[in-house]
Amino acid sequence: MIEQSLDNLILASSSERRVALLKQINIKPGLVLPADIDESPLKKELPKDYSIRMAKSKAEKIQSANPNYFVLGVDTVVACGRRILLKAENVEQAEKCVRLLSGRRHRVYTSVCLLIPDQSKQHIRTVVTIVKFKRLSEQEIKYYLASEEWKNRAGGCNIQGLAGMFVLFLRGSYSSVIGLPLHETNCLLSNYFNLY
């Protein structure tokens, strides 16, 4: 298959996983630019709303400097109930997240925002996936934390790596949990690009 190079598409992300996921469906953005935004949740902000706001903010930040481009902003949020689990900045935070998720269901919200040049239009899709982890032993928790796979991961979890062995079930989109819902992203982009 030939990879589609979409020269006038910017992926507003620093995530190599998202670039790899786009490549999986033969899409190569013209540019990949990280958006430096404040990612602090608002008081009492719900996980889905936070995910949408972050995806939109990332896209808007990049498009403000590149108004003639389509911009794809994406954000993935792990939530236990209404509690948003941010990226762990240290091993203590990662341990809190892993212990909280142990033996429980949690939701992963991934929002995709596509901005059209000059912000004449915006499209937002959010995919919710339910994931259940097995009850983790102390040994498993220590082993996972020592791996440092939790670094720069929403909720401190990398199901492509070691945390994959903790998943009892996943209901929804696997690619969304990794960082980009492929079906929804393909549908959004195919409205504006000839992908086939």
UniProtKB/Swiss-Prot annotation:
Q: Which InterPro entries does the annotation name?
A: ITPase-like_fam (IPR029001), Maf-like (IPR003697)
Pfam families found in the cross-reference section: Maf
Question: What's an example Gene Ontology biological process for this entry?
Answer: nucleotide metabolic process
What is the predominant subcellular site recorded for this chain?
cytoplasm
Can you state which reaction this protein catalyses?
A: dTTP + H2O = dTMP + diphosphate + H(+); UTP + H2O = UMP + diphosphate + H(+)
Indicate the residues that form the catalytic site. D75 (proton acceptor)
Instruction: State the compartments where it is located.
Output: Cytoplasm
Q: What cofactor is this protein dependent on?
A: a divalent metal cation
Taxonomic superkingdom: Bacteria
Q: From the UniProt record, which GO molecular function terms apply?
A: dTTP diphosphatase activity; UTP diphosphatase activity
- Broad EC category: hydrolase
Positions of the site: Important for substrate specificity?
A: R17, T76, Q160
Q: What is its EC number?
A: 3.6.1.9
What keywords would UniProt list here? Cytoplasm, Hydrolase, Nucleotide metabolism
One GO CC term on file: cytoplasm
Which family would the database say this protein is a member of?
A: Belongs to the Maf family. YhdE subfamily.
Describe the function of this protein. Nucleoside triphosphate pyrophosphatase that hydrolyzes dTTP and UTP. May have a dual role in cell division arrest and in preventing the incorporation of modified nucleotides into cellular nucleic acids.
**What's this protein's name?**
dTTP/UTP pyrophosphatase
Q: Which organism is it from?
A: Wolbachia pipientis subsp. Culex pipiens (strain wPip)
